[in-house]
Structure formats: structure tokens, C-alpha cells
Amino acid sequence: MSAPARVLVVDDSATMRGLISAVLNADPDITVVGQAADALEARQAIKQLDPDVVTLDIEMPNMNGLEFLDKIMRLRPMPVIMVSTLTHRGAEATIAALEIGAFDCVGKPQPGDTHPFRDLADKVKAAARSQRKSMITSNRAAAPAATAVSDSRAGRKIVAIGASTGGVEALITVLQKFPANCPPTVITQHMPHTFTKSFAERLNRLCAPTVQEATDGARLEVGRVYLAPGGERHLEVHNAAAPCCRLVDHPPVNGHRPSVDVLFDSVAELAGRNAIGVILTGMGRDGAAGLLKLRHAGARTFGQNEKTCVVYGMPRVAYELGAVETQLPLGSIGEEILKTAAARKEGIE
């Protein structure tokens, strides 16, 4: 049996430190070894305690969590889980933190929340098991300029991508390979509900295609990428004559809403062999069954390989199910999607 994950909790609120510590200490596989109220205390605690994982508040006095995270990643890389308020400002800072190299993020409890930090323990344990990879330097920096796709072919394909932990860096890496006239692309990324709008805005600034948070009824168009809104509804595609987004208020699937499986299932039914399915880094198994359905429908399917995953969970389950046709390093996935889109000539029936 492995030793419990050793965690340092950093937050300027004593109440929040106590709540996070109580939630984590309730798990027998986790031990909170220390607490810190600001970056200076945290720096000393990291040196003295050498924790496996740090939970870090975004907003702190003197040096904020984003600045401190940057120092950690440059000087002493380790898994860090960001704890953020569910506000637009908090979301923007969290997206920036995930780009810098934070392992994952959780939202602070809202009034009336009966299960605060319900996913935090699982994320801490996954972080402790992971070997943090600097995808920013190993993959994103090597991305070549995007190559345009034939417009006549781009509109006949639908690309569907699913991701979870590590997905912010992974999606930036993939989408920066896409040209302005990429095939219509739909994405489900597990993320708190207030964060996806900021993430879509960030992707839109960084990438050649237009990236937007999906809205109900939005028609799928060449050169556009649609990101499922977090937390409240599932993203599907429907209407073969004029494919568009549909947001549905169904119960969580695999513990997630939106669910990657729900998206993949709908794309398999709508597009079949004219779809391209991709499963990226993430915890759990969401998306594996849906990717298998895509492959059985004739779609090409790709999975991120273990070496470049922050968490080789979703891609591993998909691969073991036989859902993944080809495993690829993250830096090659965007280019392979475009090659596949250019090669397949069939239209949606």
C-alpha cells in the first residue's frame, strides 16, 4: 500500500484552510502536513515539509497565487491545484494558472453548497501519482504554422474532442495547429461552470479559428470551435441537414455534466464515418465508451499517449476498450486531425 499523499494547504482565509484540510484529511489516502496563509509562509513550508501536492488560493495578499505558482513552476516544479472563486476574474486567473502548469483547479464553495470540494480529494490523489510534464515547452513551442484545409472538405467533417485534467494546455497545443478554416470542432472539457467562457475567450485569442462557448442552436461552421459550457448542461450535435449544437439538461454521466460520452455519442449518430474523435488527458473514463461508438460508426479515432498525458486516465480506458485507432504524442495530434480531415471525402449522409 502506498503512503498517503502529503498536502500543503495555502489560503489567506483560516476558515477556508480549515475546510480544505478537513475535506482532505477525511480521505485515508491523504494527509495535510501543513497550512500557510500567504506566499512567504508557503515558500518556507515547501522547503521544510516537501509536500507531494500544494493547494493554492488564487487571490492572496502580497504575492497572489498566480505569481507564486509561476515561481514554483520555474524553481521547484510540483503538482499544484488552484482554488478559485467562481467569478469571471477568478476564472481568468485560473485559466492562466493552468497554462503556467497548475495540475488542476477547483472552485470555492457557493452558499448552499452541501458538498464543498467534492472532487478535491480525487484530484489531489491523481496529482500525487502524476509525473508532471511541461507540455508548454515540449509540445506547444514546437507547433508549426497552421496549414489551411480545402474548404470543400473542411465543411464535411466534424471533429469532436474530449479532455479533463491537463486539458487546458493540451487543447491549446492542438488548436494552435488548426488553420482559420478548420473543420467544425466541438469540445467537452471538464471545468467549473464559470470557467469555460474565459477559456473559450483565451483560446480565441491564441488560435486561428474562432473559438466560442457553445450556445443552443449554434450552427456548426467551418473555422469555428465550440466549447461546451461547464457544469449545467451536456453538449450534443444534431440535425444532419444543418448540423448544430444542442444543450441538454440531463443528469450527469460518469459523474460529469457536460460529459464527453454524451458529445461523442451524438457525433457518432450524426456524422458516423465523417467524424474524427479525439480523447485527451484526463482522470476517469468519461469519453471512452463514446469514442468506441464513434469508431464502430466508422469515424477515425485518436488518443493522447501516456508519455504526454498529465493524467493517463480517459485515454488509457479508451485504448483498452479498443476505441482508440491510433495513439499519438500531444504535439502530433493537431496535424494528424488535419491530415485525416483532408483525406476523407464523404459528406454527411
Swiss-Prot record:
It comes from Rhizobium meliloti (strain 1021) (Ensifer meliloti). Coiled coil: none annotated. The keyword Hydrolase applies. It comes from the Bacteria. Its main location: cytoplasm. PROSITE patterns: CHEB (PS50122), RESPONSE_REGULATORY (PS50110). Its EC number is 3.1.1.61, 3.5.1.44. Belongs to the CheB family. This is Protein-glutamate methylesterase/protein-glutamine glutaminase of group 1 operon. Keywords: Chemotaxis, Cytoplasm, Hydrolase, Phosphoprotein. It is found in: Cytoplasm. InterPro entries: CheB-like, CheB_C, CheY-like_superfamily, Sig_transdc_resp-reg_Me-estase, Sig_transdc_resp-reg_receiver. SUPFAM superfamilies: CheY-like (SSF52172), Methylesterase CheB, C-terminal domain (SSF52738). GO terms for biological process: chemotaxis. The active site is at 164, 190, 286. NCBIfam families: PRK00742.1, PRK12555.1. Involved in chemotaxis. Part of a chemotaxis signal transduction system that modulates chemotaxis in response to various stimuli. Catalyzes the demethylation of specific methylglutamate residues introduced into the chemoreceptors (methyl-accepting chemotaxis proteins or MCP) by CheR. Also mediates the irreversible deamidation of specific glutamine residues to glutamic acid. Phosphorylated by CheA. Phosphorylation of the N-terminal regulatory domain activates the methylesterase activity. R.meliloti does not have a group 2 operon. The modification 4-aspartylphosphate is found at residue 57. The gene is cheB1.
